[in-house]
């Protein structure tokens, strides 16, 4: 898992990226898999309102670029629940993200299709 200090979002990185060097805008998070599920952590860090409020209080910087200081990340309080509940929440979060991605693609295709039909209608009427 890596955290972008600029976007303030966490993501799971594929094993193909093991050993790569991170820029200063990213922080690697190591896990004790018996204690905290990675997908549950992603949900908490990216979407859970309690953690969002904590992150907002920690922001530093000027202008458009506000970042979370690395030292502040250790102070974020993560609600720990049973591992089975963490896994359920993490899987539900992953499915929600996947569904949103599919819906975004569908929306884009629908817009392209509609625009194509409308443009063709305009071209056909000009003749």
Which functions belong to the PLM regions below?
Residues 56-61, 106-109:
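Short, surface-exposed recognition loops or helix-turn segments adjacent to catalytic cores
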Residues 37-42, 71-108:
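Amphipathic alpha-helical segments
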Residues 102-127:
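Short amphipathic coiled-coil heptad-repeat segments
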Residues 38-59:
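Glycine- and charge-enriched low-complexity intrinsically disordered segments
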Residues 1-3:
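Generic structural signal for buried aliphatic residues
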Residues 6, 20-27, 60-84:
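A short glycine-rich beta-alpha junction/loop motif
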Residues 5-45:
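A short beta-sheet element
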């Amino acid at each position: 898992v890596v955290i972008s200090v600029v976007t303030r979002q966490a993501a799971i990185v594929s094993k193909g990226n093991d050993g790569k060097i991170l820029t200063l805008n990213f922080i690697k998070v190591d896990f004790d898999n018996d204690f905290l599920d990675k997908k549950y952590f992603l949900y908490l860090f990216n979407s859970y309102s309690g953690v969002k409020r904590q992150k907002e209080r920690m922001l530093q910087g000027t202008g458009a670029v506000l970042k979370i200081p690395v030292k502040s990340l250790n102070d974020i309080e993560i609600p720990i629940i049973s591992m089975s509940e963490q896994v359920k929440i993490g899987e539900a979060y992953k499915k929600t993200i996947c569904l949103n991605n599919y819906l975004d693609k569908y929306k884009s295709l629908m817009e392209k299709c509609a625009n194509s039909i409308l443009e063709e209608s305009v071209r056909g009427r000009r003749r």
